[in-house]
Amino acid sequence: SSAASDVYKRQDPDAVRPNALMLGYPVITSGPLAHRGSFDCLLGDNSDNQVALDAVSIERHIDAKTPPVFVWHTITDDCVPVENTLMLVDACKKAGVPVEAHLFPQGGHGLALGTAETAWQGVNGIEPCVQQWPVLANAWLRRLFA
């Protein structure tokens, strides 16, 4: 990992910055509303190290250089609390970062497109209300890059 950080330092940050972020049911915070399993996998033996946790807690790093954000989540996600998305939206708003957020009333985590093609275990994961997020994202991208 130290080699990767050195390579990044030699890059032009503006050249490697994404033009936009599109996130679905994202893990944002390492705080009390965190999805602990994500941080255990990400940080391994350092998953209890507060400095490391703060370094990967996204809401702490949103600033004016953050690219525009499109995000969606379901209110009933029982894996990653919807508050993660709300924290992201709040941080973007405070930093003046354009953000479009869609909260759908039902659906669990891992819905993908919410269609029969992406459903898992039979009908689990078919959520008609969620099926509109790709259309919304496409419209957002068209506005953003028009």
Language-model segment annotations:
Residues D12-Y25:
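A conserved short beta-strand
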Residues P26-H61, P67:
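Mobile cap/lid helix-loop segments that gate and shape the active-site cleft of serine hydrolases
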Residues S1-Y8:
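Short, small-residue-biased leader/transition segments that mark boundaries at the very start
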Residues I75-D78, Q106-G108:
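Acidic beta-to-alpha connecting loop that harbors the catalytic carboxylate
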Residues K65, V71-H73, D77:
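Short beta-strand/loop motif that positions the catalytic acidic residue
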Residues M22-Y25, W72, F104-P105:
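Alpha/beta-hydrolase-fold catalytic nucleophile elbow
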Residues D78-M87:
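Conserved alpha/beta-hydrolase "acid-adjacent" motif
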Residues L86-A146:
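C-terminal catalytic histidine-bearing segment of alpha/beta-hydrolase fold enzymes
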